[in-house]
Amino acid sequence: MLFRSEPFALGGWTLRFFNTEPDSYHKNIGENDNSLAILAEQNGRRILLAGDMVNDTGDLARLANAIGRIDALKVPCHGERAVPQEALDKLRPETMIITNCLAEISDDVLVGIMSAFGRKAYSTSDSGGIALTLTHDGLEVSREIQLRETA
């Protein structure tokens, strides 16, 4: 079951929390299955921060069905677990942010990103930080590249 909060305003954004009730009816699930997701909306643009959600009990698929099309996705669980293709097909994010180094990202996640035409993926390991800025033309991605010194 996927519980959601009522939307509320914060600054110029409208926020809605998803997965707000603990999943207690599945005995063998990890804490990531109880992770919150936040949908942030402003001027018709939609960003989903999917936390550490996993799809062990179908939450990601239900979340995608409840939310529909988004502009950007913070890939859940650091990209270590696959996002079901069914969920990616519903969400259809143009931009994906992965909070992990590329070497740690699941092959299934990489295939999902690469198989979707037009999706751009950014990894925080390649950047000192990633910022999404809302512009009149859409979302702008800013990255601070950290150079690694070699010995």
Model regions: which residues?
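Core dinuclear metal-dependent hydrolase active-site scaffold
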Residues: 3-72, 126-151
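Cap/insert and terminal regions of metallo-dependent hydrolase folds
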Residues: 58-131
